[in-house]
Amino acid sequence: MKKLLLFLMLIPFLAFTQSVNEVDANGLKQGVWEKTFNNGNLRYKGQFKNNNPQGIFMYYYDSGELQAEKKFFHLGTAAATHIFYKNGKLKAAGLYVNELKDSTWNYFSTDSVLMMSEQYQKGQLNGVTKTFYYTGNLYEIKNWSEGVEDGAWVQYFMDGKTKMESAYNGGKREGKQIFYFPNGAVYYNGLYAEDKKSGVWEYFTEEGISDTIMNYNE
Protein backbone atom coordinates (compact mmCIF):
# COMPACT_ATOMS: atom_id res chain seq x y z
CA MET A 1 0.00 0.00 0.00
CA LYS A 2 2.86 2.38 0.88
CA LYS A 3 4.57 1.62 -2.44
CA LEU A 4 1.35 2.36 -4.31
CA LEU A 5 0.95 5.69 -2.53
CA LEU A 6 4.58 6.61 -3.27
CA PHE A 7 4.09 5.78 -6.96
CA LEU A 8 0.93 7.86 -7.13
CA MET A 9 2.77 10.79 -5.54
CA LEU A 10 5.55 10.57 -8.14
CA ILE A 11 3.21 10.54 -11.16
CA PRO A 12 2.87 14.38 -11.39
CA PHE A 13 6.65 14.79 -11.31
CA LEU A 14 7.24 12.07 -13.88
CA ALA A 15 4.65 13.61 -16.16
CA PHE A 16 6.54 16.90 -16.25
CA THR A 17 10.01 15.41 -16.64
CA GLN A 18 11.43 16.41 -20.01
CA SER A 19 14.04 14.47 -21.89
CA VAL A 20 16.70 16.60 -23.59
CA ASN A 21 18.79 16.47 -26.76
CA GLU A 22 16.43 14.15 -28.63
CA VAL A 23 16.08 13.56 -32.35
CA ASP A 24 13.18 11.84 -34.06
CA ALA A 25 13.23 8.94 -36.51
CA ASN A 26 14.16 11.36 -39.28
CA GLY A 27 17.12 12.76 -37.38
CA LEU A 28 15.41 16.08 -36.64
CA LYS A 29 15.96 17.84 -33.33
CA GLN A 30 12.83 17.89 -31.16
CA GLY A 31 12.06 19.38 -27.77
CA VAL A 32 14.50 20.81 -25.25
CA TRP A 33 18.20 20.89 -26.10
CA GLU A 34 21.06 21.75 -23.79
CA LYS A 35 24.81 21.92 -24.25
CA THR A 36 27.49 22.38 -21.61
CA PHE A 37 31.08 23.60 -21.44
CA ASN A 38 33.92 21.27 -20.51
CA ASN A 39 33.65 22.57 -16.94
CA GLY A 40 30.05 21.35 -16.76
CA ASN A 41 28.42 24.79 -16.86
CA LEU A 42 25.50 25.31 -19.19
CA ARG A 43 26.45 26.69 -22.62
CA TYR A 44 22.93 27.12 -24.01
CA LYS A 45 19.37 25.92 -23.59
CA GLY A 46 16.45 26.11 -26.00
CA GLN A 47 13.75 24.20 -27.78
CA PHE A 48 13.52 22.77 -31.30
CA LYS A 49 10.62 21.64 -33.45
CA ASN A 50 11.47 19.70 -36.58
CA ASN A 51 15.06 20.93 -36.36
CA ASN A 52 13.98 24.59 -36.18
CA PRO A 53 14.75 26.63 -33.05
CA GLN A 54 11.62 27.94 -31.36
CA GLY A 55 10.94 30.53 -28.71
CA ILE A 56 13.67 31.78 -26.40
CA PHE A 57 17.23 30.40 -26.36
CA MET A 58 19.57 31.33 -23.51
CA TYR A 59 23.36 31.36 -23.96
CA TYR A 60 25.92 31.61 -21.16
CA TYR A 61 29.57 32.44 -20.53
CA ASP A 62 31.63 29.48 -19.33
CA SER A 63 31.71 31.17 -15.93
CA GLY A 64 27.91 30.99 -15.70
CA GLU A 65 26.72 34.52 -16.49
CA LEU A 66 24.07 35.09 -19.14
CA GLN A 67 25.74 35.98 -22.45
CA ALA A 68 22.85 36.25 -24.90
CA GLU A 69 19.13 35.77 -25.34
CA LYS A 70 17.59 34.98 -28.72
CA LYS A 71 13.87 34.94 -29.43
CA PHE A 72 13.25 32.91 -32.58
CA PHE A 73 10.33 33.36 -34.97
CA HIS A 74 9.44 32.73 -38.64
CA LEU A 75 10.12 28.99 -38.25
CA GLY A 76 13.47 29.69 -36.61
CA THR A 77 14.87 31.75 -39.48
CA ALA A 78 14.85 35.03 -37.55
CA ALA A 79 15.98 35.86 -34.03
CA ALA A 80 15.62 39.05 -32.00
CA THR A 81 18.90 39.06 -30.10
CA HIS A 82 20.20 40.67 -26.92
CA ILE A 83 23.86 40.24 -25.96
CA PHE A 84 25.08 41.01 -22.43
CA TYR A 85 28.30 41.87 -20.63
CA LYS A 86 29.22 39.62 -17.72
CA ASN A 87 27.91 42.29 -15.35
CA GLY A 88 24.44 41.75 -16.84
CA LYS A 89 24.23 45.04 -18.73
CA LEU A 90 23.21 45.12 -22.37
CA LYS A 91 26.12 45.00 -24.83
CA ALA A 92 24.31 44.78 -28.18
CA ALA A 93 20.83 44.27 -29.58
CA GLY A 94 19.61 43.49 -33.06
CA LEU A 95 18.08 40.99 -35.44
CA TYR A 96 19.47 37.90 -37.14
CA VAL A 97 17.82 36.59 -40.30
CA ASN A 98 19.14 33.26 -41.59
CA GLU A 99 22.00 33.64 -39.07
CA LEU A 100 23.08 36.96 -40.65
CA LYS A 101 22.79 40.41 -39.08
CA ASP A 102 19.83 42.37 -40.43
CA SER A 103 18.08 45.70 -39.84
CA THR A 104 19.31 47.96 -37.01
CA TRP A 105 21.96 46.85 -34.50
CA ASN A 106 22.81 48.96 -31.45
CA TYR A 107 25.96 48.62 -29.32
CA PHE A 108 26.42 49.89 -25.77
CA SER A 109 29.29 50.60 -23.38
CA THR A 110 29.65 48.79 -20.06
CA ASP A 111 27.86 51.71 -18.41
CA SER A 112 24.90 51.51 -20.82
CA VAL A 113 25.78 54.41 -23.15
CA LEU A 114 24.84 53.91 -26.81
CA MET A 115 28.17 53.84 -28.68
CA MET A 116 27.21 52.74 -32.19
CA SER A 117 24.17 52.09 -34.34
CA GLU A 118 24.46 50.14 -37.59
CA GLN A 119 22.08 49.06 -40.33
CA TYR A 120 22.47 45.67 -41.99
CA GLN A 121 20.96 43.76 -44.87
CA LYS A 122 21.76 40.07 -45.30
CA GLY A 123 24.86 40.34 -43.13
CA GLN A 124 26.31 43.40 -44.85
CA LEU A 125 26.37 46.98 -43.68
CA ASN A 126 23.69 48.77 -45.67
CA GLY A 127 22.44 52.21 -44.71
CA VAL A 128 23.57 54.61 -42.01
CA THR A 129 26.16 53.90 -39.31
CA LYS A 130 26.29 56.27 -36.35
CA THR A 131 29.10 56.41 -33.79
CA PHE A 132 28.84 58.30 -30.49
CA TYR A 133 31.15 59.81 -27.88
CA TYR A 134 31.02 58.35 -24.36
CA THR A 135 28.92 61.38 -23.46
CA GLY A 136 26.25 60.16 -25.88
CA ASN A 137 26.89 63.00 -28.34
CA LEU A 138 27.10 62.11 -32.01
CA TYR A 139 30.66 61.63 -33.33
CA GLU A 140 30.25 60.26 -36.85
CA ILE A 141 27.73 59.42 -39.56
CA LYS A 142 28.77 57.16 -42.42
CA ASN A 143 26.71 55.65 -45.22
CA TRP A 144 27.12 52.11 -46.55
CA SER A 145 25.85 50.11 -49.51
CA GLU A 146 26.22 46.33 -49.68
CA GLY A 147 29.16 46.27 -47.29
CA VAL A 148 31.19 49.21 -48.63
CA GLU A 149 31.24 52.91 -47.76
CA ASP A 150 29.01 54.83 -50.13
CA GLY A 151 27.65 58.34 -49.70
CA ALA A 152 28.11 61.12 -47.16
CA TRP A 153 30.62 60.83 -44.30
CA VAL A 154 30.47 63.45 -41.54
CA GLN A 155 32.28 63.79 -38.21
CA TYR A 156 31.44 66.11 -35.30
CA PHE A 157 33.20 67.72 -32.38
CA MET A 158 31.96 66.94 -28.88
CA ASP A 159 29.87 70.12 -28.82
CA GLY A 160 28.01 69.12 -31.99
CA LYS A 161 29.83 71.38 -34.44
CA THR A 162 30.91 69.81 -37.72
CA LYS A 163 34.50 68.55 -37.70
CA MET A 164 34.77 67.00 -41.16
CA GLU A 165 32.68 66.53 -44.30
CA SER A 166 33.55 64.02 -46.99
CA ALA A 167 32.02 61.29 -49.13
CA TYR A 168 32.60 57.81 -50.50
CA ASN A 169 31.69 56.25 -53.80
CA GLY A 170 31.84 52.46 -53.95
CA GLY A 171 34.30 52.22 -51.06
CA LYS A 172 36.60 54.99 -52.30
CA ARG A 173 36.79 58.59 -51.14
CA GLU A 174 35.39 60.83 -53.83
CA GLY A 175 34.70 64.55 -54.14
CA LYS A 176 35.30 67.41 -51.74
CA GLN A 177 36.63 66.96 -48.22
CA ILE A 178 36.56 69.76 -45.64
CA PHE A 179 38.07 69.80 -42.13
CA TYR A 180 37.09 72.48 -39.62
CA PHE A 181 38.63 74.04 -36.54
CA PRO A 182 36.57 73.83 -33.34
CA ASN A 183 35.60 77.48 -33.87
CA GLY A 184 33.93 76.58 -37.16
CA ALA A 185 36.60 78.05 -39.45
CA VAL A 186 37.86 75.87 -42.31
CA TYR A 187 41.12 74.08 -41.48
CA TYR A 188 41.69 72.68 -44.97
CA ASN A 189 39.80 71.48 -48.01
CA GLY A 190 40.42 69.68 -51.27
CA LEU A 191 39.23 66.98 -53.63
CA TYR A 192 39.52 63.21 -53.71
CA ALA A 193 39.40 61.19 -56.91
CA GLU A 194 39.50 57.38 -56.80
CA ASP A 195 40.52 57.50 -53.11
CA LYS A 196 43.50 59.81 -53.79
CA LYS A 197 44.01 63.51 -53.15
CA SER A 198 43.56 65.45 -56.36
CA GLY A 199 44.07 69.01 -57.52
CA VAL A 200 44.58 71.94 -55.16
CA TRP A 201 44.37 71.49 -51.38
CA GLU A 202 44.37 74.64 -49.29
CA TYR A 203 45.18 74.97 -45.58
CA PHE A 204 44.13 77.89 -43.36
CA THR A 205 44.83 79.37 -39.94
CA GLU A 206 42.07 79.55 -37.34
CA GLU A 207 41.65 83.19 -38.34
CA GLY A 208 40.74 82.14 -41.89
CA ILE A 209 44.02 83.20 -43.51
CA SER A 210 45.35 80.96 -46.29
CA ASP A 211 48.49 79.27 -44.98
CA THR A 212 49.53 76.52 -47.40
CA ILE A 213 48.50 75.48 -50.90
CA MET A 214 49.39 72.07 -52.32
CA ASN A 215 48.72 70.84 -55.84
CA TYR A 216 48.43 67.06 -56.13
CA ASN A 217 48.21 67.09 -59.92
CA GLU A 218 51.72 68.40 -60.40
Segment roles from a protein language model:
Residues 16-218:
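Glycine/tyrosine- and acidic-biased, solvent-exposed loop/turn segments at the edges of beta-strands
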Residues 1-21:
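Bacterial Sec-dependent N-terminal signal peptides
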